[in-house]
Amino acid sequence: MSILSFLLGEKKKSASVAKERLQLIIAHERVGGRPPADYLPALQKELVAVISKYVRISNDDIRVSLERQDDLEVLEVKIEIPQA
């Protein structure tokens, strides 16, 4: 963030905020070593809310999953967007 944007009070775009949240969640899971996926329903609900601002979708149109294999974690988000 630049000093100018800080002084002018520009808000971050919702995409960058969502990206930061996802990075924090994944980093937290890697450090904690807890069983995953307790946050996935909340994440799915929040993604639907954000995407619904721009495109009409329902809860059934988005699927979120987290898979772990050895040291690799994959967060998969599938979104069905209707034809325009």
UniProtKB/Swiss-Prot annotation:
Any single GO BP term: regulation of division septum assembly
Classification via NCBIfam families: minE, PRK00296.1, PRK13989.1
Annotated keywords: Cell cycle, Cell division
Family: Belongs to the MinE family.
Name under which the protein is recorded: Cell division topological specificity factor
One Pfam match: MinE
Function of the protein: Prevents the cell division inhibition by proteins MinC and MinD at internal division sites while permitting inhibition at polar sites. This ensures cell division at the proper site by restricting the formation of a division septum at the midpoint of the long axis of the cell.
Source organism of this protein record: Burkholderia ambifaria (strain MC40-6)
InterPro entries found in the cross-reference section: MinE, MinE_sf
Keyword Cell division assigned: yes
UniProt xrefs under SUPFAM superfamilies: Cell division protein MinE topological specificity domain (SSF55229)
Superkingdom in the source lineage: Bacteria
